[in-house]
Amino acid sequence: MSRMKVLIADSINEKGISELEEVAEVVVNTTITPEELLDAIKDFDAIVVRSRTKVTREVIEAAPRLKIIARAGVGVDNVDVKAATDRGIMVINAPESTSITVAEHSIGLMLALARKIAIADRSVKEGKWEKNRFMGIELNGKTLGIIGMGRIGSQVVVRTKAFGMDIMVYDPYISKEAAEEMGVTVTDLETLLRESDIVTIHVPLTPETRHLISEDEFKLMKDTAFIVNCARGGIIDEDALYRALKDGEIAGAALDVFEEEPPEGSPLLELENVVLTPHIGASTSEAQRDAAIIVANEIKTVFQGGAPRNVLNMPVMDSETYKSLKPYIELAEKMGAIIAQALPGNIEKLDVTYCGELAEMQFDILTRTMLQAILNPILTEPVNLINAPSIAKKRGIMVTEARRSESDGYRSIIIATAESDRGGFSVEATHIKEPTIIGINGYRVDVKPEGTMIIARYRDLPGTIGAIGTKLGQHGINIATMQVGRKEIGGEAVMVLKVDQSVPAEVIEEVKKLDNVDDAVAIEI
C-alpha cells in the first residue's frame, strides 16, 4: 500500500513536518501559487496551510484524493469549509495553540493604550522628551468588558485578574456556574459597553457578529473607554470606529485585525489614539510550534484510523464519550443498512428518536452514521460522517432528531422511522452486550442484525410460516433462526428469518407471491 501524501503549502514549524514524515510522504512548497496548487492538489491526501494559501471550492473539486485540510492555527477564513463538507473532507485546526499568545497580545494592546506606549516611543525617537503629554491610566481597579468567553477570553480573565481588574463578560453560552468559578460578572452587551473602561473582543466573525460594534454601540461607551480587537476584522465597523474616535465618543482603540488586510487607505492610520498591529496576535514561536505539532498529530491520527479532536465540520467528542457511544455507532450503522435495503422507493424523510441514557448524550454522530449507511448504497459519490447531512439535505431528505427519557426497561433505545415515495419502514434497536433489533414496523422481535436476513410482512394464518419455510427449502436456503412479532391472532405480523445463504431476488419474488404474504425483503449485513 502506497504512503499517504501531505502538501505543506505554507511555512510551519519543523517539528510538525517531522511528525508527519513518520506516517506520510511530505512535500513542502511554501511558495506555491493558486494555479500551481490547482494542478498539484490531485496527488495529495492532506494539505496543511496557514493564512496565505486559499483552499477554494475549485481547489477542493480538483482533489479526488484529499481527505484532510489542516489549518495550522485557528481561523479558517481561507478554507471553503462548505465545499470541503460537501466532498466529505475533514477540516481541522489547532484552536488551543494560540489561546495564550492572543490573550497576551490583547493585554499588550490594552497596556499600550493605557500608557500611550506607541506614541511615546515615536516621540522619543523623534528627539522629543514630552513626559507631561503621555499621562496614562492604571489597569488596576478598572472594569474590563470581555465579549466572548471561549479559550482566549478565558485566558484574558486569568491574566487581567492579576492586574486587579473587575471583569464583566458578555457571552450567551457561558453558564452561571462557570462564570462564578472564574469570578466574573455575566451581563448583556449594552450594560457591558456602558460600564467598561476597556472592551476586548474574542468572538468569531459570523453573520451575527459582523459589525457587532458599530455606531450605536460606540455611543453607549464611556468617552474615556478603550476598545481592543484581536479576534477578526469586521466585528468592529471601522467607519463607525473612526467617527467615534474623531468625535471623542471613546478615548482610543487597538486593532490587530481589519476588515481589509492590509488596511491601505484606512483613515484609522491617521489617528494618534489608535494602536495598530499587522495581524500578529498568533505570531509567536511557541504558538507556531504548537499549531504545527497539533495539526500534524491530528493528521497522523486520521491516517492511523483514529478519531481527531479538532474537526470543524463533524462532531468532536472526548475519549470517554466516544467510548460510551461506540457500541451505538455500530448499532446505528446496522440500522441504516437495514433501512437502505428494506425501505421501498427513494427515501424522503428520516426521523430518529434517542431514548433513555442516549437522550442525554451527544448523539449527532449516530444520526450521521445511520445516514451514511442509508445513502452509501444508493449513491455513486462517496458518503461519510462529514458530508452525510449535507448530501441528505441536497437530495431533499428531511432528517429530524428527538429525545425521550423513557426506554421501555432498556438502558437506551434508538428508534428510526424512514419514509419514501412508496411507503415507510421503522426499526427499533438497543445494545445488550451486542447490537439487537427489538422492533420492526412496530412489532416486537429479538434479532441480532448480522449475516443474511429475510424480513416478511404476512397475515398470521395457519400454514403461512410453513409455506415460507418450504419455499426457501426448495431453493436450498437453510433457516438458522426465526422471530415472529404479532399484535393479535390472525392479524398482520412480521417475521425475521436469519438464513445461512444469500437469497436471490427471484426467490424473494416467489415468497412475496405466497398466500397471505404481503411483502418480503432480503437484508445483507
From Swiss-Prot:
UniProt GO BP: L-serine biosynthetic process
Any GO MF annotation of the entry: phosphoglycerate dehydrogenase activity
UniProt cross-references to CDD domains, sorted A to Z: ACT_3PGDH-xct, PGDH_4
Binding residue positions for NAD(+): R151, I152, D171, C230, A231, R232, D256, H279, I280, G281, A282
Residues the record marks as active site: R232, E261, H279
Residue ranges of domain ACT in the record: 453-525
Protein EC: 1.1.1.95
Superkingdom classification of source: Archaea
Disulfide-bond pairs as recorded: none
Family, per entry: Belongs to the D-isomer specific 2-hydroxyacid dehydrogenase family.
NCBIfam families membership: PGDH
Name this polypeptide is given: D-3-phosphoglycerate dehydrogenase
Organism, scientific name: Methanothermobacter thermautotrophicus (strain ATCC 29096 / DSM 1053 / JCM 10044 / NBRC 100330 / Delta H)
